[in-house]
Amino acid sequence: MPRIQLAVPGEHNVYNALAALAACRLLGIAPEQIRDGLEAYRGTERRFEHKGEYHGAVIVDDYAHHPQEIAATLKAAQKYPHQKLWCVFQPHTYTRTKALLPEFGTALEGADVVLLADIYAARETDTLGISSRDVADAINADQPGKARYFGSFAEIEACLSREVRAGDLVLTMGAGDIYRVGEE
């Protein structure tokens, strides 16, 4: 099998490529065709999607919203060249946030700075008394000052505008509409 250079980052994408490779081999596809296909794959929308640059900082968006996905995405992001890794995270649903609150703190350890937007409610209403401020508090309990809660996208954008520097990596993450921050 020829050596393959993937265009998508992350160990999880290596496993995906290996599964695709195995399926292709079972189907009798030539190794060179497999290599060409895997090397041409640039990923999918909202999965470590390069959105552009802002004053020399790279903006990337990812749909990750479960702690395991978040940790995998941040692990991939750490291998991406950057000075500081900013994670702009929007928790998805009140029930998920409450149920997985301790895991979010651990999953977000891979970022240098975590900026939190309000929870994306989707189909829910807030009956659990949980907010993104609770996620920030959980992170800051172990890593003081690492996480900051903002009530609006405009506040997050203002913070990024003031503090992000050339060479930084800004990763918007969540299943809701947090990608809009990276587009502004």
Regions found by a protein language model. Name each.
Residues 2-6:
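Structural motif
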Residues 9-12, 19-46, 50-184:
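ATP-dependent carboxylate-amine ligase
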